[in-house]
Curated annotation (Swiss-Prot):
Keywords, alphabetical: DNA-binding, Metal-binding, Nucleus, Receptor, Transcription, Transcription regulation, Zinc, Zinc-finger
SUPFAM superfamilies xref list: Glucocorticoid receptor-like (DNA-binding domain), Nuclear receptor ligand-binding domain
Every NR LBD domain range: 216-514
Protein's name according to its UniProt entry: Nuclear hormone receptor family member nhr-85
Region (Disordered): 28-48, 465-514
CDD domains: NR_DBD_REV_ERB
Domain of life: Eukaryota
Entry's localization field: Nucleus
Zinc finger NR C4-type: from-to: 113-133, 150-174
Length: 514
């Protein structure tokens, strides 16, 4: 089947392995189970003294991505300072008692300043605030300072790293969150009131997180430079790690998996505000989006050098035709997008909100990336991107199902090699030379080894030529006396020994004949 009508298929897709592996045909329907169920394929054979015990890990194979793939992502995702705060939150979770001091530690985590989202030092002027905002508000009220008017329509984002940029908007936000000179409290805040204030503070944390993300996307040029640079590095890494699939099979080694995986994680880390997500959440997002990232990066790369002029042709009997055709169609749609929008679309695939529905931060990050995509690609990109990401997600599920089926077949094949000899009726799976080696090859190899040994040790060559002396210690294997010809042979040996003992003559080696 020729797929050249819809464009060439990128060779360094994760599914490029499936178009080259010579496996038995598998049912192309993903809705109905195959004719031979996995339970029947993996059912253990009857126990026998000539068959080894197969480990349970082979009888119950895990999914393809549950071992090396998952552990590699967990080891490659680095921890950040935010993880320490959330680990403290995990240690304090479940405790109903609040902290005794005015510090930020409570049963729900760290309390942030309601003005700049920095770590709050206590309850100041009616709100939780940091030392910087507390001092700024006190100076502004006591000295009655009139600040210069804002040049950005009084709509500046006030965060920890830019709170001194616009003092007019900072004072305005102090008043907006409820800071008042009359609300100053001396002494300790009661626990009940502090708990109530903290609940209200939790409601405003979403807005604070949105502001923290938005401040990192103010400079659109810098954002695009970071993402495009990491995206180009990812494409170059994928091209180096794989070769042309129409000339040789793709190698399945640790470098073949780890190096592209590290490049995909580096691309995710280049997304502004992505490292502000906790390590556990980033691992979960990457485990469910690495395939999407590699597919989008591969489809948008230049792959003309990896394919013959007539396009890519594959054997229908050795691959599932649905998956290559789907990749071909999605790749053509990706190449029709504006080039500057593909890196942003890939970043959106990493931060999809449905991959981590319990967290607000990935959803807020995805919202900001959608805004960037709209500015770069316009309404057309916003209209086509959701359906494209949905199709990529469906293809990811097909890919997982395909690998799981291949894993079951390979495990069943390994069991047949361990449990029972392979029948001669399967020349496709094993070469004939492996199934039944010729006898001439065995005799030739054994004789050549013996001759080489004699040449290296001429001093014992004569010993090898002498007839073997039969030991009289009785250390030979016990004979089965139930056989008639064995009983006759034993009787003749006993009579011969008695005659020799009577004659007092040393026995002379003779050749017995039936």
């Amino acid at each position: 089947m020729d797929l050249s009508t819809s464009g060439s298929l990128p060779c360094h897709l994760p599914l490029s392995l499936l178009t080259n592996l010579q496996t038995p045909p598998i049912d192309t329907s993903f809705s109905s189970p195959p004719a031979t169920s996995s339970s029947s394929l993996l059912s253990p054979s009857p126990s026998s003294a000539f068959r080894p015990v197969v480990p349970k890990s082979l009888m119950n194979p895990q999914p393809a991505m549950d071992t090396f793939y998952m552990s590699a992502i967990q080891s490659l995702v680095v921890s950040t300072t935010n993880d320490d705060q959330y680990s403290e939150h995990g240690a304090l979770e479940g405790s109903k008692s609040l902290a005794k001091d005015e510090n930020a530690s409570t049963s729900a985590g760290t309390i942030l300043c309601q003005v700049c989202s920095d770590k709050a030092s206590g309850f100041h002027y009616g709100v939780f605030a940091c030392e910087g905002c507390k001092g700024f508000f006190r100076r502004s009220i006591q000295q009655k300072i009139t600040y210069r008017a804002c040049t950005r329509a009084e709509d500046c984002l006030i965060l920890r790293n830019n709170r001194n940029r616009c003092q007019c908007c900072r004072l305005k936000k102090c008043l907006a969150v409820g800071m008042s000179r009359d609300a100053v409290r001396f002494g300790r805040v009661p626990k009940r009131e502090k708990a109530r204030m903290f609940e209200e503070m939790q409601k405003t944390n979403v807005q604070s997180q949105r502001d923290q993300i938005a401040i990192q996307y103010e400079n659109l040029t810098e954002v695009m430079h970071k993402i495009n640079q990491a995206f180009g590095t990812l494409q170059a890494t994928l091209e180096k790690c794989t070769g042309p699939i129409y000339t040789d099979r793709c190698p399945i080694t640790s470098n073949f998996i780890v190096i592209p995986l590290k490049a995909a994680i580096d691309f995710a880390n280049s997304i502004p505000a992505f490292l502000s997500i906790t390590q556990t959440q980033r691992v979960h997002l990457l485990q469910n989006s690495v395939f999407d990232v590699m597919l989008l990066a591969s489809a948008s790369a230049s792959t003309s050098q990896h394919f013959p002029p007539g396009g890519l042709t594959y054997d229908q009997s050795s691959a599932n035709p649905i998956i290559p055709q789907a990749i071909q169609s999605i790749s053509a749609r990706i190449r029709q997008l504006p080039p500057q929008t593909v890196p942003i679309l890939t970043a959106i695939a990493v931060c999809q909100a449905d991959l981590l529905p319990e967290s607000q931060q990935p959803m807020l990050l995805a919202e900001r990336l959608w805004c960037v995509l709209g500015k770069l690609g316009g309404i057309q990109s916003l209209a086509t991107a959701p359906s494209l990401l949905a199709d990529v997600r469906t293809l990811r599920q097909w890919h997982s199902d395909r690998l799981r089926q291949m894993s079951q077949i390979s495990q069943h094949f390994s069991q047949n090699l361990l449990i029972a000899p392979v029948a001669a009726a399967a020349p496709v799976l094993l070469p004939p030379a492996f199934l039944s080696p010729p006898a001439s090859a065995t005799s030739t190899s054994s004789s050549s080894v013996k001759s080489e040994f004699i040449e290296r040790h001429p001093s014992i060559a004569s010993l090898l030529e002498r007839p073997r002396r039969i030991s009289s210690s009785g250390a030979q294997e016990p004979l089965n006396l139930s056989l008639p010809h064995v009983r006759h042979q034993v009787k003749r040996d006993v009579d011969s020994d008695e005659q020799l003992e009577e004659m007092k003559v040393s026995p002379v080696p003779t050749t017995l004949s039936e």
